[in-house]
Amino acid sequence: GAITDALSRNGKFPLTLIVLDEVQQYIGSDTQKAYLVQEVTETLCKHFKGQLLFVGTGQSALSGTANLQRLMARFPVPVMLGDWDVENVTRKIILAKKPTAQPEVDRIWRANLGEISRHLRGTKLEHVTDDESVMTADYPILPVRRRFWEKVLRTIDTTGTVSQLRSQLRVVHEAVLATADQAVGQVVAGDFLYDQIAANLVSTAQLPREVFENVQKFAAGDERMQLKGRLLKLIFLINKLPSETALDIGLRATEDVLADLLVTDLKAGSSELRKALPPLLDELQHKDRLVMSLDGGGGTEYRLQTRES
């Protein structure tokens, strides 16, 4: 048939893998679709005498729903994805570096370990010694920020690890593209995640349109206005964490935390940035009336102030 003609080489049919991406979402609760997927995979596997292998992906195990259980005989090997798999895929596929570039990356982060290790200190996301074994592999994303992103993505996407993997792959890929032309020593800011998920969050009513429009307005302004917009993005992302999660990891949108996540130039350090934040936060609170401050034991915390709140 057409498949044999297209794939055969020298009259031999090669071992062939076919991936049915998001087959679970395609089938849904439709028993007819489940039956058709079962029939097609069985027929083709028999016809090609085991030379054809099907892999199906979904948000949860096949045993999770009655409609998918009928496929278990056809897809007998379950593979559950965990956080470690997500990190491995992003490091090996997207963040891989030429061997010639690795020594320079290694030298830069080691020279700036003082700045890196102070970020989010005192929280469960803080720098740990183990980070140093993946720092070169993760560059231009700092491990502390990767952990922050994972927490936020898990909060906004409750469908499962497969979907989170896709979200993380996309975000990491965009982060690499955004920093590709910059000098070694530039890292991706914590607020970068906002730009990747904002449109989707507006459409699902998880991001107030008022916040979205103000961020866009600030982004179109000068450097000072842009920094205000970035503060707003970060405050939104941190506020997005459920209160029990934020309490558990010890993360609050304080001046120090915001500065820790905003630093992009490791060589320049963060002292100038830290000096610039207080007047901007004051403006966002008293002039723009977009944030409010709450005084607590660990310093002043900032929260979004929208008409809805």
Please place each PLM-identified region on the residue numbering:
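Short, amphipathic alpha-helical interaction segments positioned at domain boundaries
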Residues: 297-309
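Sensor-1/coupling segment of RecA-like P-loop NTPase cores
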Residues: 44-68
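Substrate-engagement module of ASCE P-loop NTPases
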Residues: 2-9, 36-52, 96
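C-terminal helical "lid" subdomain and adjoining coupling/linker elements of P-loop NTPases
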Residues: 33, 105, 116-230, 234-237, ...
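Conserved small helical "lid"/interfacial subdomain of P-loop NTPases
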Residues: 80-124, 139-141
